[in-house]
Amino acid sequence: MPWMPKILGHQVLKIGGLSGEVTTNLPMHHQIILIEKITPNLTALCNAKVSLVQVSLTELPFIQKEIHTVFLMNTLNFAQDPHQILRESHRVLADDGWIFIALFNPLSPLIFKRKMGDYPLRHYPAWRVMDWLSLLNFEVIEKCPIATKNKLATIFSPITLIIAQKRTYPLTLNPEKVRSKIPVFLEPVNAFKLKS
C-alpha cells in the first residue's frame, strides 16, 4: 500500500478480530489488538511487539491523542454502535493520525447476507461512512475497492477501503471579514473634492 510509508509514530491500534489478523509491516514500536472476545487465532499473534486486550469497543481504555494509526477492518459492519466506535477512535487518535476502514460493499453479492456465522451483518455505503468521518474532522485521502482472488477491482468488489487522516483544524474555515481602511483619495465622497 502506498500510504504505509507515510505513517509515523509509536503505536498502532487494531480494533476488532479481523483488524488483528491483518499483517502490517509498519515500523511501529507497538501494535495493540482490541477485541471483545479473545480467540486462539489472535492469541497466536501475540509477541513482544503485539498486545491483545479484551475490552468493549465502544469505550477504549486509552487517553486522548495517544495512538498514531487505527485499523477498523470490517469492524463497523458487525458493530451495534458504529458511530461510537468512530468517536472513540477519533478521541484516542493523535493529531494528523491515520485511520484505515474496510467495509463490505453493499453493491457486492454480499448484499443479501444478513449474518456471517453468528454475527449480524450491517451494510454501510462508503459515502455514509465518509460523511461520518467528515463530521469528526477527518480528511478522506482515498477510497478504493479491493478485489479478491486475482480479480479486477470494480464498483462491485466485495470490500471498500477508506483511508482518512485526522485534522487538527476544521476543513472549512469561516474567516471573519477583515476591513481595511480605504485611503481618503479613493473614497467616492472625496473623489471630486479639490485640495485646498
Where are these regions (language model features)?
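Class I SAM-dependent methyltransferase Rossmann-like catalytic core
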Residues: 1-6
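Class I SAM-dependent methyltransferase SAM/SAH-binding core
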Residues: 7-60
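Hydrophobic beta-strand segment of the Class I
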Residues: 70-71
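A short His-aromatic
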Residues: 74-79
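A short glycine-rich, Lys/Arg-flanked "PGG" loop and its adjoining helix->strand segment in the class I
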Residues: 83-98
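Conserved class I S-adenosyl-L-methionine
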Residues: 98-123
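Short alpha-helix
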Residues: 119-143
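C-terminal lobe and adjacent flexible extensions of AdoMet/dcAdoMet transferase-like proteins
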Residues: 158-196
